[in-house]
């Protein structure tokens, strides 16, 4: 790249040297000794309007020293924008102050950096195979327990409930029924319709029932049921 720039600079200087070279006036049958640049109205110009590079240097590069770097002009501090640093620490300009410590020296144990604690290595655990064990279920054999039977304490009392007598009669004006069982339960009831066709029409019932208790005693209850409700009467019923 530097060689290319040197060649370009040499060509530029050569062209500039040719432009400023002195050319003596040559004889011309038209102009003879008269300068073509002298203004003379009416004089014939051989080739008017054609560009003549010998008349000026328009468009040609002319090298000069404008813009060249000037290392030291002796005016530092006079013009604005120059760096005005200080050679001492704390002065204006923020001068760089190096360290006197030798960083290349090995400090050994005196230097204590951040300690890295290695993580514990966890070894994989191999699962222990477990063999299933069959446990037979315990069979419980049922035990028969006989129910406790309490014999009756009364004489002539038993639990037979078969019907040994039955009577039933139903009529438009009333009804009547009677039944007796093997365990000596006896019941009879009769009902009659009274005040037929009036506002006080209703049925009047009268009956009784009796049975032999566990103590061998016969208990009887007589009752009526009418417009006054159900009324029972017996020797063992409190008055």
Swiss-Prot record:
InterPro entries: CHIT_BIND_RR_consensus, Cuticle_Struct_Prot, Insect_cuticle. Residues 49-58 have a biased composition (Basic and acidic residues). Residues 172-239 form the Chitin-binding type R&R domain. It comes from the Eukaryota. Residues 48-73 are annotated as: Disordered. The keyword Signal applies. The gene is LCP30. Residues 1-16 form the signal peptide. GO terms for molecular function: structural constituent of chitin-based larval cuticle. Major cuticle protein of the integuments. May interact with both chitin and epidermal cells to form stable cuticular structures. One of its GO terms (cellular component) is chitin-based extracellular matrix. A motif (Cell attachment site) lies at residues 73-75. Induction: By juvenile hormone. Keywords: Cuticle, Signal. This is Larval cuticle protein LCP-30.
């Amino acid at each position: 790249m530097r060689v290319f720039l040197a060649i370009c600079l040499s060509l530029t200087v050569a062209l500039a040297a040719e432009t400023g070279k002195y050319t003596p006036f040559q004889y011309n049958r038209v102009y003879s000794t008269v300068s073509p640049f002298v203004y003379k109205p009416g004089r014939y110009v051989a080739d008017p309007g054609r560009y003549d590079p010998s008349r000026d240097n328009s468009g040609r590069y002319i090298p000069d020293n404008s813009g060249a770097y000037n290392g030291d002009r002796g005016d530092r501090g006079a013009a604005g924008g120059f760096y005005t640093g200080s050679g001492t620490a704390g002065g204006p300009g923020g001068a760089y102050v190096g360290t006197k410590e030798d960083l290349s020296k090995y400090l050994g144990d005196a230097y204590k950096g951040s300690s890295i604690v290695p993580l514990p290595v966890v070894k994989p655990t191999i699962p222990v195979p477990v063999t299933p064990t069959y446990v037979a279920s315990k069979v419980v054999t049922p035990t028969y327990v006989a129910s406790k039977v309490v014999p009756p304490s009364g004489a002539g009392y038993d639990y037979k409930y078969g019907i040994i007598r039955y009577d039933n009669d139903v009529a438009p004006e009333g009804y009547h029924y009677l039944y007796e069982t093997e365990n000596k339960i006896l019941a009879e009831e009769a009902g009659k319709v009274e005040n037929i066709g009036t506002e006080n029409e209703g049925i009047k019932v009268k009956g009784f029932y009796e049975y032999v208790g566990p103590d061998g005693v016969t208990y009887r209850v007589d009752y009526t049921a009418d417009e006054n409700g159900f009324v029972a009467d017996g020797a063992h019923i409190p008055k």
